[in-house]
């Protein structure tokens, strides 16, 4: 209640409460950010990196099947799955040379970090600029069939706006050009 002879005016009280509410909201947002950083801070790549999948690898001639989400592509699934299927990289000639070209092309990509590199398997994480979303990308050399199988999948979200498909198509074109 404001007294008639009070030196505090109604306009001053409104300003005071606006500033109080703004200050409290700022504290709440700051506390939420600190909690999020504490919770997600153990992950090496940031808040939007997600967790590394546990089903990585090329087993029995195939990668793990993509989820229902349209943010992944794989060359080892049924061709009828138009959302997820992508053709493997076909090569002619020396398998080791084609594999070497692929490995070099992956390492040269912005945001790429090779996690596992073997004679016939490559696993890399691709971190997007800005928000730091991470995609898991795998390649497997099938020298007998003259192909390199691939799988590229987003860890988070539902749609990737074609990022995973474009990535492997760019790598395909870079290998063909060399």
Regions found by a protein language model. Give the residues of each.
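Ser/Thr-rich, low-complexity intrinsically disordered terminal regions
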Residues: 14-23, 33-178
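N-terminal Lys/Arg-rich, disordered targeting/topogenic segments
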Residues: 1-19
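Acidic, proline/glycine-enriched N-terminal capping motif
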Residues: 27-28
């Amino acid at each position: 209640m404001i007294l008639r002879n009070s030196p505090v005016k109604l306009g001053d009280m409104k300003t005071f409460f606006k500033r109080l509410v703004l200050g409290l909201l700022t504290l709440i947002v700051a506390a939420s950010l600190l909690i999020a950083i504490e919770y997600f801070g153990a992950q090496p790549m940031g808040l939007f990196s997600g967790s590394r999948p546990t089903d990585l690898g090329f087993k029995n001639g195939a990668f793990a099947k993509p989820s229902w989400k349209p943010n992944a592509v794989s060359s080892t699934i049924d061709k009828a799955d138009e959302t997820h299927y992508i053709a493997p990289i076909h090569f002619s000639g020396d398998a080791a040379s084609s594999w070497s070209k692929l490995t070099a092309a992956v390492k040269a990509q912005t945001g790429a970090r090779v996690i596992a590199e073997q004679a016939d398997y490559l696993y890399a994480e691709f971190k997007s600029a800005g928000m730091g979303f991470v995609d898991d990308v795998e390649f497997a050399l099938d020298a007998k069939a003259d192909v390199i199988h691939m799988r590229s999948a987003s860890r988070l979200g539902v749609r990737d706006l074609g990022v995973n498909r474009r990535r492997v198509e760019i790598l395909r074109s870079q290998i063909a050009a060399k």
